[in-house]
Amino acid sequence: ALFKIAQIYKDYQESEQTFEKLEETYVVNPDGSSVTEDDWNDDTRIQFDALKKENPDIMAWLRFDNFDDVHISYPVLYSGDDSKYLRSDIYGNYHIAGCIFLEGLNNPDFSDYHSIIYGHNMRNTTMFGDLKRYKNDEGFYEKNQFFNVYTADKVYRYQIFSYYDVDEDS
């Protein structure tokens, strides 16, 4: 049992390190310098041409405004197959956390009236794990209402209006 727990922890750490490295490498200020956690704004640019060399399915980058509270800053992938990134990393290797991905029936350019983004609710609060705080912390919403989706063409700004727990079997 201890080995299994250690393996899960190691997997979580490897996943986070992969995404942090992608952010350090491909998320930049207009002058080309690396973006720090506090630098993110509408002028922040994702180097999608270079990032797509890592995986051509990367369509966007999702990031919450208040990164001190909500540690969500990930690429959003799209393949048209909702199971592809459920349990695999951006390189196609098995990984329990999978990736953040766009619903297969959506257009990958976020032009639909509703775009559905999936991600796991990890116990260590990675991926979409911090979102459960909307349910359990009354003041959390007031401080964490907004997030941005950065695409190659524009930045979409969204306000959260609801939270819903979905059973894993649904």
State the predicted function of each range.
Residues 1-170:
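Solvent-exposed, non-transmembrane regions of membrane-associated and secreted proteins
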